[in-house]
Amino acid sequence: MSKIKVLVVDDSAIVRKIFTEELSKYPDIEVVGSAPDPFVARDKIVHLKPDVITLDIEMPRMDGLTFLKKLMRHYPLPAIIVSSLTPKGGKLTLEAMDIGAVDAIAKPGSSYSVGDMSGQLVEKIRAASGARVVRKSTQEMFQPGSRLSIRSLAETSNKVIAIGASTGGTEALKNVLSRMPPDSPGILVVQHMPANFTTAFAERLNSLCQIGVKEAADNDSVTPGTALIAPGNYHMILRRSGARYYVQIKMGPMVHHQRPAVDVLFKSTAKYAGANAIGVILTGMGADGAAGLLEMKQMGAGTIAQNEKSCIVYGMPKEAVKIGAVDKIVHLDSIADEIVRMV
C-alpha cells in the first residue's frame, strides 16, 4: 500500500520539526518535505507532488490565505489548516475553509499537547488524502437555495433537529442552515472543531442565515428559529424538563477521539426527544454519529445522510448507512428541503 505523502508548510522551524517527527512515526505516512513559506512550498509541491499539505495560516512573505487561493486555482490538493487557538485564528481558519481547505487543527501549545495533536493530525491527514477537493473561484459566494417555509410555529415547537459533521462540514452546514426558514424547529449542531474556532463559526453562520445561530452555553434552551453550535472541546447533550428542551455542555471523555462528539448529541436526542427529532449526518471521517443516529431511528426519529457524491469525505454517512441508521440519503443541496418535509 502506498504511503500518504505530506508536505509541512509552516514558518516555525519548531513546528516543522514536531510535525515531521510525529508524522514519521506512522508507517502509512511519509513527510516528503517541509517549507518555511509559500514560495518554497510552491516549488516543493510541483516537484514532490504531495497528497496532502499542512498549511500555517499566518506566515511572512505571503499569508496562508493568499497562498491557498492560488493553490486552489492552479494546483488544487487537500490542505489542512494549522492555526492558533485565538479568535483571530478561528476567523482566518473559516476563511480558509471557504476557499477550499478540507480541515483544520490547532497548533500545539500550553493547553494542547503534542500528543493530543499527533493522533488528531494523523486522522485528519488520512481523511484528507481521500477528500474530494472543490475548486472555487476566489469571487465565489455561497448562494442560498429557495426560501423554505414551515406550516406554523406551534406545530414545530416540540421538534428538535440534531446535525453532526466533521471534515468538510463547515461548508456543508453553511449550505443546510442558510436554507432553513426562520420558523424552523430548534437545531443542535456538532461540528468537529477545536475550541475558539466554534465561536467564530457560529458568528459567521449567524450573519448568513435566516435563523439565529450561536455557540451553545450550558442550560441554553432549544427554541424554534435558533441553531446552537457545540463549543469546541465540550460535549453537547440534549435534556428535557417538562415541555422545555435545553442543552448541557460538559467535558467528559472523548468519544471516537472527539469532543464534541456527534454520538453524544444523537444518543441524548434519541433519549429525550424520541420521535420528535430529526437526525442528520453530514460529510466527515470516521464513524462518529452512526450508532447515535441508529438509536434515534429506533426511537422513531426521521434520519437523513448526505450522499457520497456531495461529501468531501464519505465516512460518517457511509457508516450510518451501513448499519441501517438512515431513512433518506440526500444530496447536500436537498437536505434542508428534506428536513422541512420530515417536520
Curated annotation (Swiss-Prot):
List localization entries. Cytoplasm
| Processing after translation | Phosphorylated by CheA. Phosphorylation of the N-terminal regulatory domain activates the methylesterase activity.
| Boundaries of every Response regulatory domain copy | 5-122
Any Gene Ontology CC annotation: cytoplasm
| Keyword terms | Chemotaxis, Cytoplasm, Hydrolase, Phosphoprotein
Q: What is its main location?
A: cytoplasm
The residues annotated as the active site are 166, 192, 288
The main enzyme category here is hydrolase
A single Gene Ontology MF term assigned here is: protein-glutamate methylesterase activity
A Gene Ontology BP annotation from the UniProt entry = chemotaxis
Record's keyword annotation contains Phosphoprotein: yes
Q: What is known of its domains?
A: Contains a C-terminal catalytic domain, and an N-terminal region which modulates catalytic activity.
Which PANTHER family does the UniProt entry name for this protein?
Answer: PROTEIN-GLUTAMATE METHYLESTERASE/PROTEIN-GLUTAMINE GLUTAMINASE, PROTEIN-GLUTAMATE METHYLESTERASE_PROTEIN-GLUTAMINE GLUTAMINASE
Put simply, this protein is called Protein-glutamate methylesterase/protein-glutamine glutaminase 2
